[in-house]
């Protein structure tokens, strides 16, 4: 089976590429900017998602059996600053990919977000009514509707939560951002009243490949880890995992954030019915933390900065 992954240079997209290779499938990896090497055989190819003709030509030439859309402008701040540009990727690009996939008979997996909800009645089922507070959530909800309107067969939309993992460039995930802030001499303020249900990208990518393998699983689903935690406590747990003094993180409140009304305070998921239909089991936060690695370019700094650097064994 030949599987195309869009957004291959991102945190989730790169994990999906690794999972595809691990399962023994043929990989077509595409990224908008950076080129990433996954093995001697597989490398990502630059493909502008806004170029309809080039996108169509590439997929008609390659004719993949499945397409996974991890491509998105996912920073709410970036979306707010450039909503029209974000719309081209988050909505128009997703709709275009769904249509092309349907035309060539490829199974289509589209990744969405917990930010389609307002956070007032967590935990959410996949059948609950969305009510996004910000532009990013509104765009992802629109992308869901566009994608699901293409066909009700051979297609799945998967909403996901806050992601833990190791990105190719070492700059995308929660722990990477925290470590880079500390390296620059900053102390971070994280909110103890902003609750999320983090998910491992490695675990999530296994679920995505299972969805590809299960053409009977169509429609809208939720996936996450199996525990809720505040952003503040997650930051503390990340520092403890790497033997760094947790006092480097300051406790704050989301209520003190400017425009906090546009940011959901409590987002968590009910994972059924998907959890009972796939072999992959959602991970605890402790299990997710064990997967995290220090980016290579930060390792020398980390050895000097951490109180107990020997608690971490590098895998590069």
Regions found by a protein language model. Give the residues of each.
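N-terminal Rossmann NAD(P)H-binding glycine-rich loop of SDR-like oxidoreductase domains
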Residues: 1-23
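N-terminal Rossmann-fold cofactor-binding loop
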Residues: 29-38, 48-49, 71-72
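NAD(P)H-binding glycine-rich loop region in Rossmannoid oxidoreductase-like domains
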Residues: 47-89, 100
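NAD(P)-dependent short-chain dehydrogenase/reductase
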Residues: 148-196, 202-203
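Glycine-rich Rossmann NAD(P)(H)-binding loop
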Residues: 190-195, 221-228, 277
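Mid/C-terminal beta-alpha module of Rossmann-like enzyme folds, strongest
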Residues: 207, 214-260, 265-266, 299-316
């Amino acid at each position: 089976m030949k599987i195309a992954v869009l957004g291959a240079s991102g945190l989730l997209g790169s994990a999906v590429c690794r999972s595809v290779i691990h399962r023994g499938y043929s990989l077509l990896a595409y990224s908008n900017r950076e080129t990433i090497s996954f093995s001697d055989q597989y490398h990502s190819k630059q493909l502008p998602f806004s170029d309809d003709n080039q996108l169509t030509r590439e997929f008609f030439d390659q004719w993949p059996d499945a397409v996974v859309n991890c491509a998105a402008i996912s920073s709410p701040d970036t979306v707010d600053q450039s909503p029209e540009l974000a719309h081209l990727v988050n909505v128009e690009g997703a709709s275009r990919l769904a249509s092309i996939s349907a035309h060539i008979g490829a199974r289509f997996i589209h990744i969405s977000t917990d930010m389609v909800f307002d956070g007032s009645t967590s935990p959410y089922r996949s059948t609950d009514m969305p009510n996004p507070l910000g532009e990013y959530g509104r765009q992802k909800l629109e992308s869901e509707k566009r994608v699901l309107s293409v066909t009700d067969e051979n297609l799945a939309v998967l909403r996901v939560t806050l992601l833990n993992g190791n990105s190719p460039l070492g700059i995308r995930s929660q722990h990477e951002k925290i470590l880079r802030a500390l390296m620059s001499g900053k102390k971070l303020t994280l909110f103890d009243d902003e609750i999320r249900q983090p998910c491992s990208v490695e675990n999530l990518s296994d679920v995505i490949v299972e969805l590809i393998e299960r053409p009977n699983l169509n429609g809208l689903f939720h996936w996450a880890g199996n525990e809720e935690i505040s952003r503040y406590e997650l930051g503390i747990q990340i520092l403890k995992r790497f033997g760094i003094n947790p006092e480097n993180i300051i406790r704050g409140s989301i209520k003190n954030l400017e425009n906090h009304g546009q940011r959901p305070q409590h987002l968590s998921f009910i994972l059924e019915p998907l959890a009972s239909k796939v072999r992959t089991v959602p991970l605890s936060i402790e299990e997710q933390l064990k997967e995290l690695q220090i980016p290579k370019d930060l390792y020398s700094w980390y050895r000097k900065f951490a109180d107990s650097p020997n608690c971490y064994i590098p895998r590069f």
